[in-house]
Amino acid sequence: MKWNETGRVWEEDHGMLDAEQVAQCERADKAEPLRAPIPTRMISNGEYMPVRQTEQQRRVEARVEELADDASRRLGISRRKFLHSSGGMAATLLAMNEVFGRFFDVSLVEMFEPAACAAAGPPRDLFVFDDQLHFVRGSKPSPAGLRAIAQGPSSAPTVKSNPFNPRGQLDERGESWGVWDPKLVGLPIDAGYAHITRFIKDVYLDSQVTIGLLSNVTASMVQIEGEKARAPRNAEEAQRAEILTAAQTAAARNFINEISGSTRMLCHGMLYVGKGNLAYIQEQIDQNEPDSWKGYNISNAAKVDNDPNSLMRQWRHDDEEVAYPTFELVQKNYERIKDRKPGFNNICVHKGLAPGPPDPLRGHPGDLPKAARDWPKLNFISYHSCIQPNFFMADTLKDIQADKLRGGVPDISWTTEYAQLVKDLPNCYAEIGTTWASSIVTFPTVAAHIMGQLMKFMGEDRILFGSDSVWYGSPQWQIEALWRFQIPEALREKYGYPALTESAKRKILGLTSAKLYGIRAVDAGSYKPVPKDYESRMSKDLKTLLEFEKVTADNMSKMKETYAALAIDPDNTRYGWMRV
């Protein structure tokens, strides 16, 4: 099916461009003369009609060409070689700043000096605490759709179109399926990309993450043989459908910390709420010693009674009968073990990324104020900052452009409302996983407003970085984007947003989380590296627990290592169709 925007209906879709449409296009690898590091026109994989290059894209392309010609002459190299270098990326970011507004901290000297380009990136001493990391147990496949949204059209044939943009809307670069992380382009999406062997490489060898918080997902539906899919009856039954169980999460944390000889990972416990789940919460505390808790309002994770046959359901933070007994148990144990687990009182809950009405059961923030006031010793960390749009921000950008306001700033559903609701509640914190990833590259205007509003209403001390990796590859591209990002002066003046200073970035990227989890050492150099031979150190018992019958070095990791050893520059070739 395809979306007809004019009639606002779904229509039959035969899947590929027809002959008449193809006649209006040209192959992207032939039609794009410049091949800048970032595309300057929309590319189609053949399943949707690309739009013509916009005026803003033409201006970016012309400016990149001008900068590249000048720089390549000065450096005595070809324009093509220049565009393949870090200088080419700097030139493209400079051109985008000139056309779209100054979103990225980049200077002219970076076009000529690779060292300057590196120096402008995240410093080596940067302490990074990634509040949201995921991997999948070995018996389950990695989710293709989440990787595809970050990888773009090269995800085909596994994923043939943007899974979160069925209407073919355009981002700020004029693309309906823009690449978030260029390093993913061309890699196959296989069932093991989010398994532990590649997870460790992506997070601890390929990024600046100092400490990572391994998260998990409370299962909402289970498939029992002979039955239709349904909500689980209890937390034990829900384990069948979890991407990672509480025991597996804790075992991975223990393994990584043991082989590195320092605290490189913390882990969540599974927040199954309700009277009927209290015994399971205590069991996790006694057996796994989680560092904090992760839950989902939208998940059927609340056991409201002790009837063994009743199904679990969704829940709210402010439900005194359902959530409060769980909060009471967490707080009671926190008083007992807080010296050993200082972040145990952090209640992290997925909020947002859910189309539909503004209901706390779907992640709306309306249930937070009462709970935060009733439980001042608990910290309520809202993952994704309650953003409602599901991975693609085109409608949000239109609302901003239409000057649709709430409290004097553009109304970004439900993030603006969230920031204003909890602004005076010091135990409420905003985590930006996926919200940041889905906006920083493709919708930088939206990213600027989100960051500006969180800083304006909640302050730089209550915003936490999370990458939601490894769904979107290594966290490094998000770390670099945040370090280089800035809120344009025009937006700051119009809406009263604070500047995103280096001090603020250091807090967001790690220092605030360090305080929440009682981490005293915030010098990245004081943490020992995860050894490169981590795979050979995995015990048979650990492999069995993580449901890997045989864990071996995957071919893709070997290919990436070979590619890096050859020091091959990316050629910026795009594949697909462009409108002519």
Model region roles, listed by residue range:
Residues 132-138, 350, 384:
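Histidine-centered divalent metal-coordination motifs
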Residues 52, 139-193, 230-234, 307, ...:
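Active-site gating loops and adjacent loop-to-helix segments of metal-dependent hydrolytic enzymes
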Residues 128-134, 150-191, 201-227, 264-270, ...:
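Divalent metal-dependent hydrolysis catalytic cores, especially in the metallo-beta-lactamase
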Residues 1-77:
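N-terminal secretory signal peptides
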Residues 291, 300-302, 307-465, 473, ...:
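Catalytic pocket-lining loop regions of alpha/beta-barrel enzymes
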Residues 137, 216-363:
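Active-site gating/metal-coordination segments in enzymes
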Residues 3, 7, 69-77, 96-133:
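C-terminal segment of N-terminal export signals and the immediately downstream linker at the start
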